[in-house]
Amino acid sequence: MVIAVIPARSGSKGIKNKNLVLLNNQPLIYYTIKAALNSKCISKVLVSSDSEEILSYAKSQNVDILKRPIELAQDDTTSDKVLLHALEFYKDYEDVIFLQPTSPLRTNIHIDEAFKIYKNSDANALISVTECDNKILKAFICDNKGDLKGICDDEYPFMPRQKLPKTYMSNGAIYILSIKDFLNKPSFLQSKTKYFLMNKISSLDIDNLEDLKQVENIQKMKGCVVWISGLAGAGKTTISSGLYKKLKEKYNNSVLLDGDELRKIFKHTGYTREERLESAKKISSLCSFLAKNDIIVICATISLFEEIYLLNRNTIENYFEVFVDCPMEELILRDQKGLYSGALKGEIKDVVGVDIKYAKPNAHYIIDNSSKTDLEKKINNLYNEVELFFNKER
C-alpha cells in the first residue's frame, strides 16, 4: 500500500499563508490534494501541518490530517524530519509519496507515471526532476592548495557543451520512497534512486506572487488548436485521446474532436477528394471558433490537404500541427477492416493514400508511429511539446 504525505506548514516568507492562498478560486493546497486523491496508486492521503486552518480545510477534502509540532514547522525544518514524524503514525505502508503543495501543475497522471517507473525497477526511491543548463559542468572549484579543479571532471570545462552529459534539478513535485529504506536512512536520495522527468511548465513551484500569477495564467491557457492528422490506421485517434486526457487534467477548457464523429455531425455524404476537402474546411472553421472562445481543441482528422494546412495557419491564431507518420506497409498490416487491401485491389474507391493523393505537412511535430511500441512515451513527448509551445510567451 502507498501513502501520500502532503506537508503544509503555516509560515511562509514569500506569500503569507501560502498554502491557503487562492489560485483560480481554489486554495493552493487543493491542487495537490486533488492530484493525490485522483491517483490510481495512492491508497491513503495525509496532510501534515501545524495550522488548524490548513488541517480543517484538509479534513473537508476527506483526507487524513496530522497536527505537526511547532518545532517541526520552522523555516529551517527539513523535509526528511517532517516525513519521519508522519511515518511514526503510519508505519504499515510499503511506500510513501511526498507531495509538496507548492507544485500545483503536478497532476495525478504525473504521480501515476512516476510510480510506474519506480515500481517497474529495483529502485528504493524516485525524485521528479526537470532538465537544467549543463554549463555548470564547465565550472571550476579551487581546492585548499589554491589549485583549480573541474567541478565534476577535469575534462568537462574544455568539452563542447553538446558532448557534456545532461543535467537535472529536483523540481520538488514528487518524491517516492520505500518506507523501510527511508526509516533506515532518512534521506530522499537512496542507494537506488530513479528519476521522473517533467517539463518546465509542470515543474513550476510557487515561491512568490510572480510565480502565483504565472501559474494562474497557465491554468487559464487561452484557446488554441492542436491539429493531429495522419492516414487511417496511423494511430492519430489513440494519440489524440492520450494527449486530451493529459491536458484535461490541467486545463479544464480542453475538448477532443474526432474526425469520424465530426463527419456525422456535419452530415458528411461522401469520401471523394472534394467532399473530404469540404468536410475538412467545416472542421477547421469549428476549431477556429472554439479556440477564439478560449477552448483548447485537440482535433484528430485525416484532412491531409495542403489547402487545409494553409487555411489553419492563416485563420487560427494559436495553432500547433502534428503529423502521425506511418508507412503504407504497416498500415496494410493494421488494416482490420480491409480498407487498404480493398482499395489496392480496386474494390474500394476514394481512399486517402491509395487513389487520393495526400500532402505530408511541414508540421510543428512529427510522430513516427511505424511501431505501436512506446506509445505512452510518444504521448508524453507530444504533451510536453504542446504545453511548452503554447506557454512559451508567458
UniProtKB/Swiss-Prot annotation:
It catalyses: an N-acylneuraminate + CTP = a CMP-N-acyl-beta-neuraminate + diphosphate; N-acetylneuraminate + CTP = CMP-N-acetyl-beta-neuraminate + diphosphate. Pathway: Capsule biogenesis; capsule polysaccharide biosynthesis. This is N-acylneuraminate cytidylyltransferase. The keyword Transferase applies. Keywords: Capsule biogenesis/degradation, Nucleotidyltransferase, Transferase. Belongs to the CMP-NeuNAc synthase family. Its EC number is 2.7.7.43. It is an enzyme of class 2 (transferase). It comes from Campylobacter jejuni subsp. jejuni serotype O:6 (strain 81116 / NCTC 11828). Nucleotidyltransferase involved in the biosynthesis of capsular polysaccharides. Catalyzes the condensation of N-acetylneuraminate (Neu5Ac) and CTP to form CMP-N-acetyl-neuraminate (CMP-Neu5Ac). It comes from the Bacteria.
